[in-house]
């Protein structure tokens, strides 16, 4: 399936159950990483992984895999940049490539794609409102975007699981 055909996954589908999740915001220079608590309620920033597009050894993917192992993640959520018209953005190809490389390294832990429209814009706004100057944003913007991606997934997952329970209880 081509990148243009890749749609975001649905939270709660094929859910692995309780456990930490890792959220990833793929950028060309930096990759933001966030983690959830074991109950999947709250996303928090973890780190920013440096990335060199000329590096063909995949050092950034190895670091991401090490974080998945360190946090004992049951699921990884990678932001999939889509345009407002719901098409794959230029960055989507890169995000899918990183997600696929990571999936090969951490199998059988599932790697999901989540719609990340406007997460970086939202992260910049949040940092600006918190009084963080533009210069200081560079260091944390990717982590804040990863938190946004993961928190959105966690919230949608919780709603999907609750709806599923209501459907079986009724």
Curated annotation (Swiss-Prot):
It is found in: Cytoplasm. SUPFAM superfamilies: Ribonuclease H-like. Its main location: cytoplasm. InterPro entries: RNaseH-like_sf, YqgF, YqgF/RNaseH-like_dom, YqgF/RNaseH-like_dom_sf. GO terms for molecular function: nuclease activity. Residues 1-22 are annotated as: Disordered. It comes from the Bacteria. It is an enzyme of class 3 (hydrolase). CDD domains: YqgF. Signal peptide: none annotated. HAMAP family: Nuclease_YqgF. This is Putative pre-16S rRNA nuclease.
């Amino acid at each position: 399936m081509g990148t243009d055909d890749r749609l975001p996954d649905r939270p709660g589908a094929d859910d692995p159950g309780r456990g930490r999740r890792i959220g990833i915001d793929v950028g060309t220079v930096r990759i933001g990483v966030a983690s959830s608590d074991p109950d999947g309620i709250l996303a928090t920033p973890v780190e920013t992984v440096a990335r060199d597009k000329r590096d063909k050894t995949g050092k950034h993917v190895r670091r991401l895999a090490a974080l998945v192992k360190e946090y004992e993640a049951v699921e990884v959520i990678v932001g999939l940049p889509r345009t407002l018209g719901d098409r794959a953005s230029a960055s989507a190809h890169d995000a899918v490539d990183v997600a696929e490389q990571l999936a090969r390294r951490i199998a059988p832990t599932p790697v999901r794609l989540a719609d990340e429209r406007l997460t970086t814009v939202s992260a910049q706004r949040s940092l600006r409102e918190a009084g963080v100057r533009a210069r200081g944003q560079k260091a944390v913007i990717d982590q804040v975007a990863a938190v946004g991606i993961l928190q959105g997934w966690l919230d949608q997952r919780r709603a999907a699981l609750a709806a599923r329970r209501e459907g079986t209880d009724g």
